[in-house]
C-alpha cells in the first residue's frame, strides 16, 4: 500500500524557497558595453531598438512521471546581470542555488506551475505553454519582447522569439531556466518528504529505476501524471483507495 503523506506541500503559501524578487526592470537604452555572462547580442539589439523590457522564459519538468511543470520568466537588469549564467543543466546544484538568489535579488521574476491534474487534462504540451504564458503574465513589468527556449513559444501579448538551445545561448533565458530548475527541485524535495516511499527528492519525478520500482511497489500517488504511460500501466488494481493508505514513518 502507498503511504499516507505526512503533510502535502502548499506552494501557494509563503515559502522561503521562493524569495520575493526585487530590482527594477531595465529601461530602453539602458544597455551598457560592460555586460557579462552569456551572449547578450540579442538583448542588446532589442534594447538598442527601444524594445524594452526584454524577458526570457523557460520551463523545467516536461519529462518526469510526477510533479509539476515549472515555468519562469525573468527580466534581467542590464546593470546587474549575474556572472556565470548558463543552462541550468550544466551547473552544479550549489552554483544554481547561488545564481537563483542573485537573480531574485536583482531581476524581475515570475513563476507559474502546471500541476499533474492540468497535464493529464490538457496534455503536456498545452500545460507547458499555459505555464509559460502565465509566468510571463505574472511579471511585475509587461515585457515588450520575449525570448523563450525551444521552438514552441507560448501565446503572449508581446513579440516573441523562440531559440532552440536558448538556455545555453541567451542570458535572460538561462536565468529563467535556473529559476525554474531550483524552484522545481525544492518543490519535489518537499513532495519527497511527504511521500518518502518514492524518493522524489533524489530523482525529482523522472523515470529512474528507483522510481519505477517504487511505482510497482506502491502504485501512483496524487503527484503522479496518470496520463503518462509508465504511470497509467501501474493504475490497474495497484492504486489503493483513499482510506487504505498507511501512515508513513
UniProtKB/Swiss-Prot annotation:
Q: Which reaction does it catalyse?
A: Endonucleolytic cleavage to 5'-phosphomonoester
The prosthetic group or cofactor this protein requires is: Mn(2+); Mg(2+)
Keywords, in A-Z order: Cytoplasm, Endonuclease, Hydrolase, Manganese, Metal-binding, Nuclease
Q: Which Gene3D superfamilies match?
A: Ribonuclease H-like superfamily/Ribonuclease H
SUPFAM superfamilies in the record? Ribonuclease H-like
Q: Which domain of life is it from?
A: Bacteria
One GO cellular component term of this record is: ribonuclease H2 complex
Q: Assign the protein's first listed, main location to one coarse class.
A: cytoplasm
Q: What is its EC number?
A: 3.1.26.4
Task: Relay the cofactor remark from the entry.
Answer: Manganese or magnesium. Binds 1 divalent metal ion per monomer in the absence of substrate. May bind a second metal ion after substrate binding.
Q: Where is the composition biased (Pro residues)?
A: 1-19
Give the RNase H type-2 domain ranges.
Answer: 52-240
Single GO MF descriptor: manganese ion binding
Enzyme class label: hydrolase
PROSITE patterns per the record?
RNASE_H_2
Query: What's any GO biological process attached to this entry?
Result: DNA replication, removal of RNA primer
What does this chain do?
Endonuclease that specifically degrades the RNA of RNA-DNA hybrids.
Entry similarity comment:
Belongs to the RNase HII family.
Protein name as catalogued = Ribonuclease HII
Q: Which organism does this record belong to?
A: Xanthobacter autotrophicus (strain ATCC BAA-1158 / Py2)
The encoding gene is rnhB
Amino acid at each position: 500500500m502507498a503511504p499516507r503523506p505526512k503533510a502535502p506541500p502548499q506552494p501557494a503559501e509563503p515559502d522561503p524557497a521562493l524569495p520575493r524578487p526585487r530590482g527594477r526592470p531595465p529601461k530602453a537604452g539602458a544597455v551598457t558595453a560592460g555586460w557579462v555572462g552569456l551572449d547578450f547580442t540579442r538583448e542588446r539589439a532589442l534594447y538598442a531598438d527601444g524594445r524594452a523590457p526584454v524577458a526570457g522564459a523557460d520551463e523545467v519538468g516536461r519529462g518526469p512521471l510526477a510533479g509539476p511543470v515549472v515555468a519562469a520568466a525573468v527580466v534581467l537588469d542590464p546593470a546587474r546581470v549575474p556572472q556565470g549564467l548558463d543552462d541550468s543543466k550544466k551547473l552544479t546544484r550549489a552554483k544554481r542555488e547561488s545564481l537563483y538568489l542573485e537573480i531574485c535579488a536583482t531581476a524581475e521574476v515570475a513563476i507559474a506551475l502546471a500541476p499533474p491534474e492540468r497535464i493529464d487534462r490538457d496534455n503536456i504540451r498545452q500545460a507547458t505553454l499555459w505555464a509559460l504564458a502565465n509566468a510571463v503574465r505574472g511579471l511585475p513589468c509587461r515585457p515588450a519582447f520575449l525570448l523563450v527556449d525551444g521552438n514552441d513559444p507560448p501565446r503572449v501579448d508581446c513579440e516573441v522569439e523562440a531559440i532552440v538551445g536558448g538556455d545555453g545561448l541567451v542570458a535572460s533565458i538561462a536565468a529563467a531556466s535556473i529559476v525554474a530548475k531550483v524552484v522545481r527541485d525544492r518543490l519535489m524535495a518537499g513532495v519527497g518528504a511527504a511521500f518518502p516511499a518514492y524518493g522524489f527528492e533524489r530523482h525529482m519525478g523522472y523515470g529512474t529505476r528507483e522510481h519505477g520500482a517504487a511505482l510497482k511497489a506502491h502504485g501512483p500517488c496524487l503527484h503522479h501524471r496518470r496520463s503518462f504511460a509508465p504511470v497509467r500501466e501501474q493504475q490497474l488494481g495497484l492504486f489503493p483507495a483513499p482510506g487504505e493508505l498507511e501512515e508513513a514513518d
